[in-house]
């Protein structure tokens, strides 16, 4: 395999690449997370199916890489499990709010069992996350996860408050990204560093988490339903103002005059957003955040830990390429 192809594979599958870099100890930790997630979710069918649907497990990976040289395995595993449970809970709740039929190629809990069951399933995963982390006996870690959970909820409320509002600024949008998405990346870094007695990586987590959300919003405009689990332009139809739309309204006078409540053909509007260059501009902004996060990694990191974090950042960027 050529060097370029190897680099591409590493960035597109950071879990596998970092597993090779971190050795058997890291692979054992990731396997322990999967085992514990299945144990916790076994009590309820919808919860278990949510966990079994899988995912990249980027947030647990961040916990482990942030605490890569830490002496203890069990506290790191519990922290990683707690973060992934919170993430899974938010996905279940998001599917209720979006009335999403698919998640990771499978029917959502909402589509299969309805709003009440999906809401209860998300609540269960949330509560089990805090129970898991409490076993570490660290008030500092519980505060970090609580702050992230509060931020997630605040971000959702800000998004609802801003619905259909064409005056949403880039600054307000980015703050919403930090609350709704990046706060959990930030918490993963803080929990890993706390359990592993490592350098503070919260700024790294916040930057790549914000980039992750921007790129996800780009994908809503450009991506097919087979990849996203929802129709193109779902954010438009929900009245959710994202960076591609904000930038497109500045570039295209027709989009600047668009009444969001009067959209008949979301696909056509998406095409106009793409044609304006707004999706590419939004993507470049996200990639700038990724590059900045890598450039600002603390000097005291070891070469293995630094490379692992760079791989995670590259994986976020390439996932949406």
Please identify what each model-predicted range represents:
Residues 44-88, 125-128, 170-208, 244-246, ...:
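Alpha-helical phosphate/pyrophosphate-handling elements in metalloenzyme active cores
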Residues 1-88, 92-111, 159-167, 226-227, ...:
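Conserved N-terminal diphosphate/IPP-binding helix and adjacent helical/loop segment
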Residues 95, 131-132:
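Glycine-rich phosphate-binding loops that contact phosphosugars or nucleotide phosphates
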Residues 51, 103-125, 167-181, 225-251, ...:
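Divalent-cation-assisted or electrostatically stabilized phosphate/pyrophosphate-binding catalytic cores
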Residues 67-71, 192-199, 219, 223, ...:
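C-terminal helix-coil-helix/basic helical segment that borders enzyme active sites and/or dimer interfaces
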Residues 52-56, 119-120, 134-225, 231:
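All-alpha helical catalytic cores of prenyl diphosphate-utilizing isoprenoid enzymes
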Residues 30-34, 86, 93, 123, ...:
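Hydrophobic faces of stable alpha-helices that mediate helix-helix packing
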Residues 15, 19, 26, 30, ...:
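Hydrophobic packing residues in well-ordered alpha-helices of helical domains and bundles
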């Amino acid at each position: 395999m050529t060097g370029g192809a190897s680099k591409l594979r590493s960035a597109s599958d950071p879990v596998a690449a970092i597993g090779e870099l971190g050795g058997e100890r890291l692979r054992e930790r990731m396997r322990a997370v999967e085992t514990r997630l299945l144990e916790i979710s076994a009590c309820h069918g919808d919860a278990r199916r949510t966990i079994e649907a899988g995912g990249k497990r980027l947030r647990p990976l961040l916990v482990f890489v942030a605490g890569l040289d830490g002496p203890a395995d069990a506290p790191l595993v519990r922290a990683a499990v707690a973060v992934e449970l919170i993430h899974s809970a938010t996905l279940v709740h998001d599917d209720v709010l979006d009335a999403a039929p698919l998640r990771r190629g499978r029917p959502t809990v909402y589509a299969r069992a309805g709003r009440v069951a999906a809401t209860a399933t998300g609540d269960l995963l949330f509560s089990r996350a805090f129970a898991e982390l409490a076993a570490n006996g660290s008030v500092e870690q519980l505060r970090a996860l609580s702050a992230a959970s509060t931020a997630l909820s605040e971000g959702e409320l800000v998004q609802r408050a801003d619905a259909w509002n064409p005056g949403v600024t880039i600054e307000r949008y980015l703050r919403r990204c930090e609350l709704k998405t990046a706060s959990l990346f930030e918490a993963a870094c803080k929990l890993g560093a706390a359990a592993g007695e490592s350098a503070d990586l919260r700024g790294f987590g916040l930057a790549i988490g914000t980039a992750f959300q921007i790129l996800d919003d780009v994908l809503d405009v450009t991506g097919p339903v087979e990849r996203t689990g929802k129709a193109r332009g779902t954010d438009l139809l929900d009245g959710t103002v994202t960076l591609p739309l904000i930038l497109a309204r500045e570039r295209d006078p027709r989009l600047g005059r668009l009444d969001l409540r009067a959209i008949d053909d979301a696909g056509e509007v998406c095409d106009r957003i793409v044609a304006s260059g707004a999706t590419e501009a939004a993507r470049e902004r996200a990639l700038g955040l990724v590059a900045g996060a890598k450039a600002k990694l603390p000097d005291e990191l070891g070469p293995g830990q630094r490379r692992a974090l760079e791989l995670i950042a590259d994986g976020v960027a390439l996932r949406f390429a």
